[in-house]
Amino acid sequence: METLSFEFPAGQPGRGRALVGCVGSGDLEVLLEPGQPGKLSIQVQTSVNGSASRWQHLFERLFDGQTPPALLIDIHDFGATPGVVRLRLEQGFEEIGHD
């Protein structure tokens, strides 16, 4: 089990909170809540040791060319594929975008 932390430049804080997925379904749970302006902070708890570079590359591809909202994101991973990670993050971003 490993805990990884990542930070990326961001815009203004997101408007809401969201919980998408669950560890037992797709092997991934993502919690999103408003963060500090200008900073997107991500904490990943994963069962896959030595996966920091995979996570770093996934986030870099996801945020490339855009300014995400300032959020605190907690990810609980039990071996999800990169496609599932991206899907859950996109679902979370959509959820916090609704009024």
UniProtKB/Swiss-Prot annotation:
Q: Which residues form a coiled coil?
A: none
Disulfides per UniProt: none
This entry carries the following GO cellular component terms, namely: cytoplasm
Main subcellular location of this protein, as a coarse class: cytoplasm
Q: Name one GO molecular function term.
A: acyl carrier activity
For the modification O-(phosphoribosyl dephospho-coenzyme A)serine, which residues carry it?
S25
Q: Which UniProt keywords apply?
A: Cytoplasm, Phosphoprotein
What post-translational changes are documented for it? Covalently binds the prosthetic group of malonate decarboxylase.
Q: Report whether Ligase shows up as a keyword of the record.
A: no
Q: Where found? A: Cytoplasm
What does the UniProt record say this protein does?
A: Subunit of malonate decarboxylase, it is an acyl carrier protein to which acetyl and malonyl thioester residues are bound via a 2'-(5''-phosphoribosyl)-3'-dephospho-CoA prosthetic group and turn over during the catalytic mechanism.
Family indicated by similarity: Belongs to the MdcC family.
Identify this protein by name: Malonate decarboxylase acyl carrier protein
Q: Identify the coding gene.
A: mdcC
